[in-house]
Amino acid sequence: MSKMKLRKSLLIAALALAAVAALVYANRMYVLMYSLGWYTDIANPREANRPVPWQTGPAAPEQALAQRPPNIIVIMADDLGINDVSTHGGGHQAEGVPTPAIDSIARDGVRFDQGYAGSAVCTVSRAALMTGRYPWRFGVEFTPTPGSLARVAGSLYADPNRLYPAIIDQAKASQARDFSDLGMPASERTVAELLKGRGYHNIHIGKWHLGSTAEMRPNNQGFDESLFMESGLYLPEKDPRVVNSKQDFDPIDRFLWPNMRYGVSYNAGKWFEPSKYLTDYFTDEAVTAIQRNKHRPFFMYLAHWGVHTPLQASKADYDALANIPDHRRRVYAAMVRSVDRSVGRVLQALRDEGLDSNTIVIFTSDNGAPSYIGLPDLNKPYRGWKLTLFEGGLRVPYVAKWPGRIPAGTQYAAPVSNIDILPTVAAAAGASLPTDRVIDGVNLLPFLAPGGTAQPARSLYWRDGPYRTVQDQGWKLIVSERPKKDWLFNLGDDPTEQHNLASLQPQKLAQLKALLATHHAGMPPPLWPSFIEMPVLIDKTLDQPQAAGDELTYWAN
């Protein structure tokens, strides 16, 4: 090749590279937005669906059912608002979508009328449930967030029509540890580990969100088997069996759709695709696992992804709700319908296998419903949302049953939290609590038994950085740094938090601030920092116009 031709070829190549670089730069936000999904496709290719090789217990029982420790099933929904469930006085009943299966647990057992999540966000709440401890005792204070999100968050959250911007600390984000390393320390003792010491076979199905390294996965936290939700699609977006609803006004939704995938793994093996709509798939596998373990005591943690975004309903459920004219509400109601159907199928499997009489079933949600799906009544009558410390973010559906031990139709008025699940089921199973650490939850069984004692007064706490809450003897204090404000409510008189008494009750304000200071003194720093603070309007959904004077708080992640 002549020098002239070589120069010409190099020039063409350079121009082509420059054009590609210019194209990438011009579409850099698109590239960044889709990068996590592309990386997932390369790092974790999904294989075709295959049967889950659930372990099989004894062919015959070693003890009569009544002599065995009770089976224990904890079903946790994701982002399910208290007004989504008809036993709590809400539900989509006007639209023909009650929740009869969830309601039946309350009918046959107890409804907790002041049932609280351990946090207003998923990871922290799940850590509380697993350990019976306030998660900030061991540094879990924020939901793990990939540092790469900060690079696109500025664009995602940029909206000139919004008065209240998100606050992003790019310096902290640039120093963020690898996303997979963020989670609950393996040194924590989980409810599964306690039950394993009593001979339980422990099964995890669904969402975990407490870390994905080997040491933090369920199999290293006391679970014998784990069907692990690896990403976040209920079905592929174009699958004819699914109906989608996208919220273009929601930055989180715009991030999820290009980056979520449809995949699970079994016992930390290779990713593979489920066989159907995710809620139904997890339910199928839960029923199979119950059948395989009917002759030995088992603990099952069925952690549904429903009804978390992205909003995707099975087409069958969507078609069954043709009476709902609004597309988004119809998709959401169909998702609620699928979660309730799952509960019903699990209960039926227990009856079919003759296990119902000696199985504890608990149903709850990890936090209240979010504002960012644009449906205004999901937490009614309570104010606030997921990512707030108002009642709408913390008060959740919470029902339980244990035939013969918890009287049917019990309505329990005292405050309870999902930190109480570990000590309660440990007591039922005869397991001892750890003595080398503080357990914040309490065993509820003495208070639920026929003629049981009254629950002693106690304080409950929540925390997200400097945004903190204490509830004590019917009073609740919320303190915030952004905005710098205190809210003081008498929940006995004002359960929906309409009247801020902070300026009218200085002595009570000081008393509760002292409780907060005492509780948080000496707590360790978070294991990882937050680098995004998101504004959440207390009384508006994300798609509603913001106005001067709107009441809001900021949530750190």
Question: Which residues does each PLM region occupy?
Answer:
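Long, internal low-complexity/basic segments
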Residues: 3, 8-16, 21-70, 77, ...
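C-terminal cap/loop subdomain of S1 sulfatases and analogous C-terminal strand-loop tails that border
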Residues: 225, 229-235, 369-391, 406-410, ...
